[in-house]
């Protein structure tokens, strides 16, 4: 019989409800769970390891110790479990990730003149989403039909500005498919009202619009205004055509989500059909590795994760688009939303102002703790909802369809994954053998430097886990000490990046707050140095950068590799394999070795290393271009304290250029609206200082 050494004494575990966490040697949370009875639940993990499910066994063996928190009720445990899963993103908890990015119809409500457009990717604040749609052409046809009725803007910002400057609309404006706000044919307020009607129609509130158009058509016909009656008839047909694309499954105004699971011993597939107003508005699917859980527990975990995520996204977006007088975005809430999960779980049916929890959730198996779950969902929805298992009729038939979809999705996933896993495993195994490593490098990091003649020197750090990019862990650095006049020391730059990366690791490992040497940025986050954003949650930051790779790759040859190794020796890091890849001959260099390792050109291992190097290069160049563009846009006005963007723009618009502002007198500047003598003197002195 085999067991683990950190098993707590059974008598020390309380019998109360609570939440427990398994943590590894780096204090990283790798699993979060809840229980009605902590002692009974935790005892299941410490039986003979050979009797555990493979995934559970791997988790227990990866852990270093277990902790628990007692709460007063099962509902409180449910809330705390969800919060901690969002906070720590444990790798052994099931995360529902979609196998593709479905296109959505998006409306940029944050813009002064909102526009409708097709969109793929993670959800953004200030944008309302409809869908997902199975095909992009379905969105294009929907827009083509509905812009006849709701002629809202669909052009990009560049096209809008161009026609605004020209003073004449585009073709869509001439054929009445756009109300042409760019040339003032409609006021911003009236255009926004039109956008609201368009959004309401897409969200399923179709009857009021249809009644209004039908009444106006009849009135126009009675007034013998046959041209307008014909136009309204065409609008009515366009709306009906758009509605026909959404299959009618129920005769009543059913507002429900149907959730179907199909699982084998290792994996589970889930399909969700979103029904609004009796019509299927969207369909999504996920395939995940299965925990050693019952079907009822799987359903409960999915509902908790999916609806908790969508409710947070809706709340954050509503706060963002609440208007000029509304509150600012809750920073802690926004930071709690995982970007990857936001992409996979946040695609709601309808817009973000429609509650993400429907009146009814239909499942094929009643989830565990259904009453507590329903109470939690009711609090998210703001009104009563129920969870049911359909027994007969149309709802049962649609559940069967959803189960069929889940079965097919699981079969397709297994076929695809068999090939992918085989290739990645072969590459990692070959890399292990080529570099004489004790184990396969499941986490690999790679860094690259980017600059132009020593200016705007930046670096990137990309992360692959299990042979796949983990973009949530990407970093980018502004190099501080390695740049000179017209040149850059790449060797010193590499050394700086390695020092900052592993010094941060040591600080996290010893639970010391990150200092000035830990200045890194996540891809997609605000470009602030040193992670010093106001309100940063130390626990969240620790999760992002808290454990070392098995393999660290630098883009360069022997000088870069030796410099990186000196830094690792200086910091006492001896559990990381370090190599470099030279661009010219694709040679792999090892510290202290006179000759490189030659890996066959057709080797999966070399392909993986090249993929890492190319991704690091792409990420570094992207950041370098951003920095260079920002520098080129800067002027002396940017450095004047108390002079904001609006006033800078006003100065350049009034005087024509920064040079002419410099030539202007204090009196000329002070004469501008909003500029007093004191500010005018400050601007004049700053621009004319030697």
Curated annotation (Swiss-Prot):
Main location: cytoplasm
Domain GIY-YIG span(s) in chain numbering: 15-94
UniProt keyword annotations, A-Z: Cytoplasm, DNA damage, DNA excision, DNA repair, Excision nuclease, SOS response
InterPro entries linked: GIY-YIG_endonuc, GIY-YIG_endonuc_sf, GIY-YIG_UvrC_Cho, Hlx-hairpin-Hlx_DNA-bd_motif, RuvA_2-like, UVR_dom, UVR_dom_sf, UvrABC_protein_C
Recorded GO CC terms: cytoplasm; excinuclease repair complex
Domain UVR as annotated: residue spans: 207-242
One Gene Ontology term of the molecular function aspect: DNA binding
Pfam families, alphabetized: GIY-YIG, HHH_5, UVR, UvrC_RNaseH, UvrC_RNaseH_dom
Self-association state and partner proteins as the record states: Interacts with UvrB in an incision complex.
Family affiliation: Belongs to the UvrC family.
Protein's name according to its UniProt entry: UvrABC system protein C
Species per Swiss-Prot/TrEMBL record: Corynebacterium jeikeium (strain K411)
Organism lineage: Bacteria, Bacillati, Actinomycetota, Actinomycetes, Mycobacteriales
């Amino acid at each position: 019989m085999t067991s683990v050494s950190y098993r707590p004494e059974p008598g020390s575990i309380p019998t109360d409800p609570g939440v427990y966490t398994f943590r590894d040697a780096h204090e990283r949370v790798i699993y979060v769970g809840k229980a009605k009875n902590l002692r009974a639940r935790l005892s299941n993990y410490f039986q003979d390891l050979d009797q555990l499910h493979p995934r559970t066994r791997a988790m227990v063996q990866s852990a270093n110790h277990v902790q628990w928190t007692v709460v007063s009720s099962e509902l409180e445990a449910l809330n705390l479990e969800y919060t901690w899963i969002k906070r720590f993103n444990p790798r052994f908890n099931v995360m529902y990730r979609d196998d593709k990015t479905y296109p959505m119809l998006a409306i940029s409500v944050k813009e002064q003149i909102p526009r409708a457009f097709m969109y793929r990717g993670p959800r953004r604040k200030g944008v309302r989403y409809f869908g997902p749609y199975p095909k992009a052409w379905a969105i294009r046809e929907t827009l083509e039909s509905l812009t006849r009725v709701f002629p809202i803007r669909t052009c990009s910002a560049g096209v809008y500005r161009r026609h605004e400057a020209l003073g004449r609309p585009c073709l869509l404006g001439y054929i009445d498919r756009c109300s042409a706000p760019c040339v003032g044919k409609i006021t911003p307020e009236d255009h926004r009202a039109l956008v609201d009607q368009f959004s309401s129609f897409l969200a399923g509130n179709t009857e009021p619009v249809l009644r209004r158009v039908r009444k106006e058509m009849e009135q126009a016909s009675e007034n013998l205004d046959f041209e307008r009656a014909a136009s309204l008839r065409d609008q009515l047909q366009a709306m009906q055509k758009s509605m026909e694309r959404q299959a009618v499954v129920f005769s009543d105004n059913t507002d429900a989500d149907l959730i179907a699971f199909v699982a084998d011993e290792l994996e589970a597939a889930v399909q969700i059909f979103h029904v609004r107003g009796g019509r299927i508005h969207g369909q999504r699917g996920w395939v995940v590795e299965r925990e050693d859980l019952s079907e009822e527990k799987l359903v409960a975990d999915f509902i908790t994760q999916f609806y908790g995520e969508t409710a947070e996204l809706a709340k954050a977006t509503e706060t963002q688009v609440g208007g000029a007088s509304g509150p600012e975005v809750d920073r802690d809430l926004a930071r709690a939303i995982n970007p990857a999960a936001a992409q996979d779980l946040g695609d709601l049916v309808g817009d973000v102002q429609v509650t993400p929890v429907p009146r009814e959730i239909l499942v094929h198996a009643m989830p565990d703790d259904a009453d507590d779950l329903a109470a939690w969902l009711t609090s998210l929805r703001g009104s009563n909802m129920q969870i049911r298992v359909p027994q007969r009729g149309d709802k049962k038939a649609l559940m069967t369809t959803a189960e069929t979809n889940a079965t097919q999705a699981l079969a397709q996933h297994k076929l695809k994954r068999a090939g992918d896993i085989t290739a990645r495993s072969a590459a990692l195994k070959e890399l292990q053998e080529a570099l004489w490593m004790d184990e396969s490098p499941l986490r690999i990091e790679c860094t690259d430097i980017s600059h132009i003649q020593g200016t705007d020197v930046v670096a990137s750090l990309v992360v692959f886990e299990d042979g796949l990019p983990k973009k949530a862990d990407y970093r980018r650095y502004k190099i501080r000490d390695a740049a000179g006049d017209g040149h850059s020391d790449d060797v010193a730059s590499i050394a700086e990046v390695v020092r900052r990366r592993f010094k941060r690791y040591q600080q996290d490992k010893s639970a010391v707050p990150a200092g000035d040497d830990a200045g890194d940025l996540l891809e997609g986050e605000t470009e602030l140095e040193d992670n010093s954003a106001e309100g940063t949650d130390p626990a969240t930051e620790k999760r992002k950068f808290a454990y070392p790779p098995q393999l660290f790759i630098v883009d360069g040859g022997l000088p870069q590799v030796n410099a990186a190794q000196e830094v690792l020796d200086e910091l006492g890091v001896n559990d990381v394999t370090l190599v470099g890849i030279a661009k010219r001959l694709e040679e792999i260099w090892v510290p202290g070795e006179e000759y490189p390792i030659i890996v066959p050109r057709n080797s999966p291992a070399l392909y993986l290393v090249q993929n890492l190097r190319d991704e690091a290069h792409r990420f570094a160049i992207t950041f370098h271009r951003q920095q260079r563009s920002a520098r080129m846009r800067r002027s002396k006005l940017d450095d004047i304290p108390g002079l904001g963007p609006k006033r800078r723009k006003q100065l350049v618009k009034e005087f024509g250029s920064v040079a002419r502002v410099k030539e202007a007198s204090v009196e000329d500047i002070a004469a501008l609206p909003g500029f007093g003598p004191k500010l005018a003197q400050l601007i004049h002195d700053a621009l004319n200082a030697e």
